[in-house]
Amino acid sequence: MYSFNETLKAGLTGILFALLASTTQAAEGAAMKMVPDPDVAKLPGVAFNQTLADSLPASIKDKKAIKVATDLTPPISFQDEAGKLVGIDADIAAALGIILGVDVQMTNVGAGAAIVPAVLSKRFDMTISGINDDIELEKQVDVIDYMYDATTIMTIKGNPLGIKNMEDLCGKKVAVPVGTFQARLVEAASANCATPMNVMSIPKMPDVLQAVRTGRADATVNGYATSVYTTENQTGKGVGLQALPDVRLAVGYLGMLIAKDNPQLRDTVVASLQHMVESGAYPAIMEKWGLGPLAVKTVKFNDAASMPVN
């Protein structure tokens, strides 16, 4: 059974939030070829690998490009002042392009809700985006679990109810997006309360956050890295809200998405990422962006069932 004290064994200390602010765009952006920064290109293992390149599907080899959908989720993926995509996802994408000898073309498709349809419609070969893996998502697409994410609590700015932990949410109104990892986390936690939480299921995350801003809900839970960054900088989805950085709840995965009828691309990407893990390139990228504690040691796919709450 889920415990309130389920936390990351390695504390997410040293998170670096000296990043440029960005705002998620509603409109789809133009495709950008991911060109690695010099520091990424020099990382160990970031070099053309013939064996991995040979394992690509013929369709990718023919066009010499992988079309990737993403969305803006700082600090994982965002745009700098010049409009260039930067962050963990951009660096990983650029490194994959070098290793596989193809152009990786990333397009910001706007809201996170557009990510799954981007793959199912076959407009894109895959996504590289900080989307939470769960068993329901895995029924639609294959999910490559490429990093962990913790979850934290968000309240209205100032935290007038003095919420400090999940126990403090017992008996409170807690808004969650329908059918998500966060919803299952809250429901599991509420089952341990003497007075259950009043769980408010709301279709979209922006409306969940608005419910907290307006006082309809007392709190919500959301991804740790994004919540802390946007609230500390009072930018984007974090405006008017406060995250609790000392609260690091059950770990889940963030995943890349690939259509289920494309196992050859999935397996090539998994092998390429594992190559980056073992060479040291992947952990170096995670450390560069201050998220080293969220790095995986083994790249798996469709592994949500192994998480504490799924």
Can you annotate each of these PLM segments?
Residues K33-Q50, F181-V199, V239-G240, L273-N310:
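Ligand-binding clefts/hinges and TM-proximal coupling segments of bilobed small-molecule sensing domains
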Residues Y148-T155, Q234-A271, G292-N310:
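Periplasmic-binding protein-like
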Residues A113, G130-E138, L185-A189, D218-A250:
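A ligand-binding cleft/hinge motif common to bilobed small-molecule-binding domains
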Residues G29-S129:
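Extracytoplasmic small-molecule ligand-binding "clamshell" domains
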